[in-house]
């Protein structure tokens, strides 16, 4: 079973949930999760919680305890907030390169699913008739303590966008597409992304135009990290990675060297851009 996670305290999340139920035939079951009705469509459960999802460590265990199923993939339907209030449709995996400021644990990463993230990015881009930005975000915030792959797909970046009906429709269709296709074979090259700003412009461009599929992305502002964290990012990627990709100008000198050395050590392709 796969899970779409929503929360009552997030306007974008409720917008997306509403569109999933209205447009994609998710129907209410007798089951409850965190006291809220569980909706189902085939092998996908649509769950709702009552608090911020970024603090929901061990969600997979809670699902197993309450519903008796171990999810194979969790998609969080969420808002994105930023001071710039840039209208955006984004996807990313969660975790903390250093100190945990917003959920999760210090130096802990959730399990990335590069195929699901790339499928999300491509579908968001295809459906985007709003003229908004479509991009990856760097790995950030919680939850980090999940033992199954997960990703956030988000509407940003202010209340005006969170409640936009078309944005909700795009996110709902994207989520269904991801869940239907993430388990199939694709000719993608999974990559660890290093460098650049929070919205990972170079990684986004590479993924939209070519075969690279990013899991964890380490932005410049979170650098430097040690080799152990880079190795953890690879280990916490479903199936591992084939490529270490570096946004050269957007990466500090010592991280360039660490990335190149690690690629050599692990016999991975190294791309500097």
Curated annotation (Swiss-Prot):
Assigned EC number: 3.1.1.96
Cofactor: Zn(2+)
Keyword Lipid metabolism: no
Record has Hydrolase as a keyword: yes
Keyword set, alphabetical order: Hydrolase, Metal-binding, Zinc
Transmembrane segments: none
Top-tier EC class: hydrolase
Entry's Gene Ontology molecular function annotations: D-aminoacyl-tRNA deacylase activity; zinc ion binding
Alphabetical GO biological process terms: D-amino acid catabolic process
Alphabetized SUPFAM superfamilies for the sequence: AF0625-like
InterPro entries: Deacylase_DtdA_archaea (IPR018033), DtdA (IPR007508)
Cofactor, free-text remark: Binds 2 Zn(2+) ions per subunit.
A Pfam family assignment: tRNA_deacylase
Top-level taxon in the UniProt lineage: Archaea
Catalytic activity, as annotated: a D-aminoacyl-tRNA + H2O = a tRNA + a D-alpha-amino acid + H(+); glycyl-tRNA(Ala) + H2O = tRNA(Ala) + glycine + H(+)
Role summary: D-aminoacyl-tRNA deacylase with broad substrate specificity. By recycling D-aminoacyl-tRNA to D-amino acids and free tRNA molecules, this enzyme counteracts the toxicity associated with the formation of D-aminoacyl-tRNA entities in vivo.
Record family assignment: Belongs to the DtdA deacylase family.
Subunit description: Monomer.
Designated name of the protein: D-aminoacyl-tRNA deacylase
Species this protein is from: Thermococcus gammatolerans (strain DSM 15229 / JCM 11827 / EJ3)
Organism phylogeny: Archaea, Methanobacteriati, Methanobacteriota, Thermococci, Thermococcales
